[in-house]
Amino acid sequence: MARISLKGLRHSYREQPASESDWAVKRLDLEWAEGSANALLGPSGCGKTTLLNIISGLLRPTEGTVWFNDRDVTALPADERNIAQVFQFPVVYDTMSVYDNLAFPLRNRGMPERDVDRRVREIAALLDLDAMLQQRAAGLTADGKQKISLGRGLVRSDVAVIMFDEPLTVIDPHLKWRLRSKLKELHQRLRTTMIYVTHDQTEALTFADQVVVMNDGMVVQAGTPVELFERPHHTFVGHFIGSPGMNVLPATFEGGVPRFAGLPVEVASPPKAPPAGARLELGVRPEFVRFGADGIPVRVLRVRDSGRYRIVETQHDATTIKLLVGEGEALPSENGYLQFDRAHTQLYADGWIAS
């Protein structure tokens, strides 16, 4: 396993990029710790797969360097980087047995057959494949085949990093949680450096200790799932993570105080005066909004049941504000007042956190 460092990295598919929009991956510096579980999260086309292919050696970056531990591997081809990659669609040898699929990478490296057998059976047991080792891979379900793809990455003890590119795309929804749980369990037991690429926040937040959120080729925030949820550095992160997403409200800054609809709003950190002409917004998640005796006057529009909570949609003038209300909590019949938890309310200028 390895510590992965990306230094001054940029990539464009154009020979002579002339503007910022020509860069598929905009300038970034990232580091993933040795043995860590990480996720690259963002919408389709944001640069996730490009970045993954640069790390694996399938692409050479236009600018910058890729380091595995203290070694610059930027110029190394993929087959010399000791990486394993699991793709969206399971890549297996259908005519081979499950056993031979798992053994294939080891036999290619000339490992003695006794050692091959020991390692294959060890990994098969971890993946719950030991009962089907002699079956042909062609007869397995999609999740079974994806386990083989994963196993071929894990079976090699010299792998620096295992990378997953949307690995649950073709898996039935009711089986996804089982594979997610298995991946997490495997990481906790093996402590191999893993990078998981997905557009699904649930997959990213339940698997990774560190999540990198990308949008439009740019890293907008990197941190733990808790950090991304409680203090989004950009309104995109607030929208993209959470269900429902963060409330983003038009704001002004008057007398040194952020305001919504002319009403003062306390925020987590006393903000500096934002740049002149900046678009100002207040961000607060529905989890940190509550009804109170006073505050922002609103009208209740609709209530939707969501398990232990109800999602309440309210309106102040033309602005919609959502909050979560517990099952046993009383709701105003029509009109009420909203209060924001100061510790989780932020001011944003042109999308970026201002405090």
What are these regions (language model features)?
Residues V25, E31-W32:
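Conserved hydrophobic segment flanking the Walker A/P-loop of ABC-type ATPase nucleotide-binding domains
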Residues N82, V92-H234:
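ABC ATPase nucleotide-binding domains
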Residues L41-P43:
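The feature captures the beta-strand-to-loop junction immediately N-terminal to the Walker
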Residues S56:
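Helix-to-loop junction immediately C-terminal to a conserved catalytic motif
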Residues P244, G256-S355:
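Non-catalytic connector elements of ABC transporters
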Residues G64-D72:
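Conserved ABC transporter NBD signature motif
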Residues N38-A39, Q85:
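Short beta-strand immediately N-terminal to the Walker A/P-loop
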